Amino acid sequence: MNVVEFGIVMEASPGYTARLARDIEQLGFDVLLCPDTQNLSPDPFSQLALAAQTTTRLKLGTGVTNPVTRDVAVTACALATLQAESNGRVICGIGRGDSSAAHIGIRNGTTAQLKTFVQRLQAYTRGETVDRDGTPSRLRWFDSLQPPPVVVDVAATGPQTIRMAVDVGDRVSFAVGSAPERIRWAMDVALERLRETGRPRDSLSIGAYVNLVCDPDEQRAIDLGRMISGMVAHFAGMKDAPLDHLPPQLKSLAAHMQSGYDMKHHAQESGSHLQAVPDEFVDWFSICGPPVKCRQRLQELLDMGLDHVYQLGGSPVAHPHGARQAAMVEQARLYATEVIPHFR
C-alpha cells in the first residue's frame, strides 16, 4: 500500500508558529508549509527555524516561494541553513509567484524562469558551483556543515508547468482544486510526461494542494472553504494562462478571475471576487463537510496515485493574524483525528 504524506499549509506568525508547529506534529501531520509572500504574511524562514526547535519529525518548508522576489542564491542560503538547523527536514515548495509578485508591481515568473531557478537552487543546495552569467557562484559556507540537498517541490497548475516539474522537480504538487476530474487530468499530464522522458515513477513524489474543510456542519464547511476555492480558481485563471483545458464548471469562473480577482484581499474572506463563487462550485472544487464525506472524497483522489496531499484549510477567525492561524489549526483537528487515520 502506498504510504501517503499528509501536510498542512499555514501562514507563519511570530509568537505562534513554533507552538502551532508542535501541535501540528502532535496531530499527526507529516509536513508544515508556510507561504513566502512578503506583503501578506510574515517571513517563513525565520519562523520555520523556530518550528524546527519544537518538532522532531515534521517536515518543514515553503508553500510556496517563487523565482522573482529573491535571488536564487538568497533562497538557497535560507533553505540550506534551515536544512542544517532541522537535521534534513526541509521541503522547498515553489511556484511561479502570484501575490508575492503582484504586491510589489512585478510579473510572476514564467515556466522557463521557474525551471532555471529550480535547477540553480538544486545545485546550490548540493554544494555545487553555479554559473551566474560567467561568474562562478557557490555557498562557500556549505562545506563546513554539509546539510543534505533540499527537496524541491514544484507547485503546478497548467500543463506546461506540470511537464516542467516532472522534468526537474523532486516532487510535484498540483494546485488545481480537489475535484476528481481536475486531479485526474493533472495526473494524466504528469504520467504522460514521465513516459515521454523515461523517468521512473518512483523517482518522483506526486501530490496535490487539496482544498479541504472538515466540519460536522456542511454549510459551515462550505462557507469556510469559499475563500480557498476562489483563490485556487484564480490560479487557473492567472493573466495569459490558457483556459482551453479547463472543464466548464471552472472555465467561466477562471476567465472572470483574470480581470475580476480582488488581489488586494488575496487569501482573505473579504475579497469582492468571492461573490462570484457559489456554494455549488465550492462543493465541487473543494472537499467540504463532515468526516465521512471528507474520507470518501479524499479516497477518490488517493486512488489516483497521489503520494502526498497538502491541506488548504479554512479559519473561523479572520483576525488578528496569530489567532487566525491558531483557529485554522484547531479547525483542522477533526480532519487530523477522524480522516487522516483512515488512510494510515
Where are these regions (language model features)?
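Hydrophobic faces of well-ordered beta-strands that scaffold small-molecule active sites
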Residues: 4-10, 32-34, 60-63, 90-94, ...
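Active-site mouth loops of central-metabolism enzymes
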Residues: 3-15, 65-72, 146-157, 212-215, ...
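N-terminal beta1-alpha1-beta2 module of alpha/beta enzyme domains
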Residues: 1-62, 150
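Short, acidic/polar
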Residues: 13-24, 78, 156-164, 291-300
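Glycine-rich, proline-tolerant flexible connector loops at the mouths of alpha/beta enzymes
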Residues: 31-54, 66, 98-101, 176-180, ...
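An alpha-helical appendage that flanks or caps ligand/catalytic pockets
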Residues: 107-143, 183-303
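Alpha-helix-loop-beta-strand connector modules within alpha/beta enzyme cores
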Residues: 45-65, 69, 124, 330-344
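Conserved, mostly hydrophobic/aromatic
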Residues: 28, 51, 82, 121, ...
